[in-house]
């Protein structure tokens, strides 16, 4: 009921499969409103658009090629309607590891990047305690050093800074940058820190981005330094996601930044071992939906502000903005050292 008060939910899939699961779970006094297009949705009910073959085979608790194919069909159908502004946001339920593996892409983020013809894209893990972006997504560990370049780090810092400002309404984001090597912060920076990461951070600062680091991942999280920052940029996915889940796994969600559309997903695993037992925790999916709705509201607010901007005030002509930025950075460093 609360979700219907905040939005008009539309499920993309098969009404027949949904009815089968409802029967398995013995859910009474609930039915989905089958519609053909978003304009027919009932604001007081949960709606479903049939975009998958009704004869699709259902294997409880198993990911199959048929289920993965149905997932991609539903995703493409929903994205088409999202592109036409027929819906406002898209939130994905937990999926199996091969759901978005295609000939064109090996992950959802890669697929979305190809669909929208952009490499300036990043998944951001979001919880109440921490936000985390990544220089590299889910790539093989041996490929990480080749992708951790000054250019890529600067691009990700810029994207993360822009996203925090526009989609999360954080006016002056403070971003912590993790090192690639474990000995960072012990006076033993590796070649990657000295020649790649630090120069990228310095370039970002020249552009007005409050980036600080590099930090050792172990020390950064064990000493709870993340509490001083608005977001963290990890060098690779496993470096960040394990630490992220140790800080705040419950109800965390993922937001795909850098797209013209709003897309979020739950970080919860599909937990095939308990399928059909009515034991799943829906909070992760619920939070992913709330996250997408919040971003939608923030973007609409930004559009309105741009329509009626305040009179321009030339900061550069009236103050030394770079000095202010340096003072803020030094202040954060002093807090971390205390």
Residue ranges and their predicted role:
Residues 1-338:
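Anion-binding alpha/beta catalytic cores of soluble intermediary-metabolism enzymes, centered on
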């Amino acid at each position: 009921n609360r979700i219907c008060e905040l939005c008009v939910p539309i499920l993309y899939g098969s009404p027949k499969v949904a009815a089968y699961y409802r029967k398995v779970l013995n859910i009474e006094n609930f039915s989905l409103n089958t519609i053909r297009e978003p304009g027919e949705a009932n604001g007081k009910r949960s709606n479903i658009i049939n975009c998958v073959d009704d004869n699709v085979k259902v294997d409880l608790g198993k990911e199959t090629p048929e289920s993965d194919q149905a997932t991609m069909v539903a995703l493409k159908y929903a994205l088409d309607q999202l592109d036409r502004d027929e819906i406002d946001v898209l939130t994905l339920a937990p999926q199996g590891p091969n759901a978005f593996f295609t000939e064109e892409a090996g992950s959802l983020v890669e697929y979305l990047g190809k669909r929208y013809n952009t490499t300036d894209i990043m998944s951001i893990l979001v919880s109440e305690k921490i936000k985390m972006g990544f220089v590299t997504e889910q790539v093989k560990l041996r490929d990480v050093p080749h992708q951790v370049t000054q250019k890529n780090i600067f691009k990700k810092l810029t994207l993360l800074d822009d996203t925090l400002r526009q989609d999360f309404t954080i006016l002056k984001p403070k971003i912590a940058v993790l090192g690639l090597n474990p000995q960072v912060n012990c006076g033993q920076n590796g070649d990657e820190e000295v020649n790649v990461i630090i120069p990228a951070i310095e370039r970002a600062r020249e552009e007005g981005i409050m980036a600080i680091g590099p930090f050792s991942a172990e020390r950064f999280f064990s000493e709870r330094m993340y509490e001083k920052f608005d977001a963290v940029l990890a060098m690779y996915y496993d470096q960040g996601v394990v630490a992220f889940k140790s800080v705040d796994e419950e109800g965390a969600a993922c937001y795909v930044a850098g797209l013209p559309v709003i897309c979020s997903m739950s970080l919860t695993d599909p937990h095939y071992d308990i399928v059909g037992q009515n034991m799943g925790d829906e909070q992760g999916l619920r939070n992913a939906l709330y996250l997408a709705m919040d971003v939608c509201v923030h973007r609409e607010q930004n559009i309105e502000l741009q329509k009626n901007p305040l009179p321009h005030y030339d900061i550069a002509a009236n103050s030394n903005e770079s000095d202010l930025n340096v003072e803020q950075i030094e202040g954060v460093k002093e807090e971390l050292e205390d």
